[in-house]
Amino acid sequence: MFPMVTGFMNYGQQTVRAARYIGQGFMITLSHANRLPVTIQYPYEKLITSERFRGRIHFEFDKCIACEVCVRVCPIDLPVVDWKLETGVRKKRLLNYSIDFGVCIFCGNCVEYCPTNCLSMTEEYELSTYDRHELNYNQIALGRLPMSVIDDYTIRTILNSAQIK
């Protein structure tokens, strides 16, 4: 008779332990139910990037003095700077400036060390194309400012990134 009682006691203990495990899992599920979703509907919703975001590089042709500091500090010698020395003025004149974003690692050294601040990082991160040759931007393409995510009325922006966590 005693083995039967101990069997019922073991069964009762196992039932209580199983109920406790199920309850713990249920509490975790309930704690996750109150959180906001992590993902966003990308083409229609966009996150506003931080101020220090390293996006596409913006270039101002008029400020550049063709010193080639950006080429020297770039770890992959990426910016191509074509210039001509004007002998009468003894000054460099910039002819062409281009960056291939298919190779760029967006380290930001060129922007940081530019003495005239003619380079800056934008919030544009949509650089994907079907042809990699389209990623080679010249001074005209680099000079275009991207449309701000905040100004685009077709896109709903997620202002506070803390809500997404």
UniProtKB/Swiss-Prot annotation:
Sequence positions that bind [4Fe-4S] cluster 2: C74, C104, C107, C110
Tree of life domain: Eukaryota
One Gene Ontology CC term in the entry: chloroplast thylakoid membrane
InterPro entries (UniProt xref): 4Fe4S_Fe-S-bd, 4Fe4S_Fe_S_CS, NADH_quinone_OxRdtase_chainI, NDHI
Enzyme class (EC, first level): translocase
Coiled coil: none
Cofactor(s) named in the record: [4Fe-4S] cluster
Keywords: 4Fe-4S, Chloroplast, Iron, Iron-sulfur, Membrane, Metal-binding, NAD, NADP, Plastid, Plastoquinone, Quinone, Repeat, Thylakoid, Translocase
Occurrences of domain 4Fe-4S ferredoxin-type (ranges): 55-84, 95-124
Subcellular location: Plastid, Chloroplast thylakoid membrane
Molecular function terms from GO: 4 iron, 4 sulfur cluster binding; iron ion binding; NADH dehydrogenase (ubiquinone) activity; quinone binding
EC code: 7.1.1.-
Any Pfam family: Fer4_10
Membrane topology, as annotated: Peripheral membrane protein
Plastid keyword on record: yes
Listed PROSITE patterns: 4FE4S_FER_1, 4FE4S_FER_2
An example Gene Ontology biological process: photosynthesis, light reaction
Residue positions binding [4Fe-4S] cluster 1: C64, C67, C70, C114
Free-text remark on how the cofactor is bound: Binds 2 [4Fe-4S] clusters per subunit.
Enzymatic reactions: a plastoquinone + NADH + (n+1) H(+)(in) = a plastoquinol + NAD(+) + n H(+)(out); a plastoquinone + NADPH + (n+1) H(+)(in) = a plastoquinol + NADP(+) + n H(+)(out)
Listed NCBIfam families: ndhI (TIGR00403), NuoI (TIGR01971), PRK05888.1-3 (NF004537)
Task of the protein: NDH shuttles electrons from NAD(P)H:plastoquinone, via FMN and iron-sulfur (Fe-S) centers, to quinones in the photosynthetic chain and possibly in a chloroplast respiratory chain. The immediate electron acceptor for the enzyme in this species is believed to be plastoquinone. Couples the redox reaction to proton translocation, and thus conserves the redox energy in a proton gradient.
UniProt family annotation: Belongs to the complex I 23 kDa subunit family.
Quaternary structure and partners: NDH is composed of at least 16 different subunits, 5 of which are encoded in the nucleus.
Full protein name: NAD(P)H-quinone oxidoreductase subunit I, chloroplastic
Species name: Oenothera elata subsp. hookeri
